[in-house]
Every structure is written in C-alpha cells, then in structure tokens.
C-alpha cells in the first residue's frame, strides 16, 4: 500500500473497520465521561497517531529498516509504565527489555538506506505513542476497569476520530485504492489485524507485568519473519534469526526467573517497612 494508497486514508479505513467490529459493544451506562475520554485517548495514541507515523515512515524505509527501528519499544514500555505508576524506575525491567532489543536487533540488522534519520525519527515517535497507548490502557484497566470489549469500543472510537481529522486535513483524494487486492488488504488489516489482533494483544497486556509486555512486543520480529516465510516463501537469514530469537526468549526467562520475583519482593519489603514506621 505504501506509495500507492494515501497513508491517511489507509489509516482511516483500518481503524474505521476495527471500530465497526466493536461498535455493538459501545456502552455509556456506569462509566464517567472522564473514564470514557481516557479510553478514547489511549486508542487515539496507540492506533490513530501511531498508524499515521508508521505509514509515513514506510515512504522512507525498507521493511527491514522499519522492523529494526521498532526494537526499542520494550524499553519505552517499561519506563513509561513506571512513570505512569509513579514508582521508582525498575532498572531490572529495563535490563531484561534491553536483552529483547538486542535479540530483535540481531535478527533485523541490515544495511540502512539514505533516509536513516527521517525514518528513525518517525518510527521512534511511533514507538513512543504506541507505548503510551498500550501502557495507558493497562493502567486504566488497573485503576478504572470496565469489560474489555466495552473498553475497546471507546478505544477504537478515539483512534477513528484522529484518523478522520487527519484525512480531512492531510489526505490526498487522488491516491485512493485502485485494485481489489488493495481493498482486500485494507479490509484484512482493519477487521483481523486491528479489530481482533489489537484486542487480543491489549487483553494479554492486562494479564502480565510491564517487563513481560515489553519483551513480548519484540516477538513480532521473529513471528513476522515466519509469517513472511509461510506466505511469501522469503527465507530469513537463519543463523541470525535463530540467535536473535534465542536471545529474546532468554530475556523473557531472565525476567520471569530473576527480575520480576526480585522486584516483587522489593516492593513487599518497602510496604512492610512503611507499615512498621507508621
């Protein structure tokens, strides 16, 4: 789609279809306007703004470069979660996330092109908005919970509003989808990848700690290459693929085995000390 279909229109169709999937679950009863607005805000950040930046980045980057530049997201997730939770930064979480970054970087590193800095800036802004939206959703489920299928109705509505505004202000009506394949890709991305995929991803995000969430974010790199192999028969570079995947899995093992239990024990000790001092 990149370069052939207007990126703002592609975002509009993608989040619009995702919003339609969850429209039957839109509920206002029992939820304050502030809560509804916050769920719309995290949707606007995680999908609306993130998609626009990502689609724009495709104009400057190869697929390999874009995947390479997304590997820093685990660090953003762990650090932003600590900031939103108003807790001390957990450097153990950052360390295990860094291992996942190294693993993904091993898999995806390739020769970069001339538009390195433009692409890098766009993708990092995209990574940050995605992390803010994802962590924001996780925090809202901890502090202002509602049934997740209802929450996602508001989530996608927020993303859709951003996409509508962007399309009217910046869209190019001369670059509409021209082929059945292009429309088919947009429908698949909207209904399956966004509508169902992001719901499952964010639901899972509420079931794990921020460190695990950050690490698993980089599993999309080996998973994406396996899908590319299955559908398009494009072989990855197996030595780096296997090495990088093992490093990512090792980072998850280190985090679950040592980092997360130690962080939990430290938090319990801190609460116990506070109770004794009172």
Predicted segments with their positions:
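Transmembrane alpha-helical segments that form core, pore/gating elements
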Residues: 18-22, 77-78, 112-171, 186, ...
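Specific transmembrane alpha-helical segments of multi-pass solute transporters/efflux pumps
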Residues: 23-70, 106, 190-208
């Amino acid at each position: 789609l990149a370069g052939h279909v207007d990126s703002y229109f592609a975002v509009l169709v993608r989040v619009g279809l995702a919003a339609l999937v969850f429209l039957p679950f839109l509920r206002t009863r029992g939820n304050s306007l502030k809560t509804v607005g916050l769920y719309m805000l995290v949707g606007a950040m995680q999908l609306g703004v993130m998609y626009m930046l990502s689609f724009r980045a495709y104009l400057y980057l190869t697929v390999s470069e874009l995947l390479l530049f997304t590997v820093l997201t685990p660090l953003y997730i762990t650090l932003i979660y600590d900031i939103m939770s108003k807790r001390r930064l957990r450097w153990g979480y950052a360390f295990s996330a860094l291992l996942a970054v190294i693993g993904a970087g091993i898999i995806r590193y390739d020769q970069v092109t001339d538009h390195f800095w433009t692409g890098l800036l766009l993708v990092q802004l995209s990574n940050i908005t995605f992390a803010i939206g994802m962590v924001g959703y996780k925090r809202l489920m901890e502090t202002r919970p509602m049934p997740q299928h209802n929450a996602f109705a508001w989530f996608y509505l927020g993303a859709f509003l951003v996409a509508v505004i962007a399309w009217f202000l910046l869209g190019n009506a001369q670059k509409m989808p021209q082929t059945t394949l292009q429309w088919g890709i947009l429908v698949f991305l909207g209904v399956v990848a966004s509508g169902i995929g992001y719901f499952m991803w964010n639901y899972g995000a509420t079931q794990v700690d921020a460190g695990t969430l950050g690490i698993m974010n980089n599993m999309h790199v080996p998973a994406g290459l396996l899908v590319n192999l299955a559908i398009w028969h494009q072989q990855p570079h197996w030595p780096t693929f296997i090495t990088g995947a093992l490093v990512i899995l090792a980072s998850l093992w280190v985090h679950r085995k040592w980092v997360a239990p130690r962080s939990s024990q430290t938090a319990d000790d801190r609460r116990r000390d506070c109770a004794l001092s009172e």
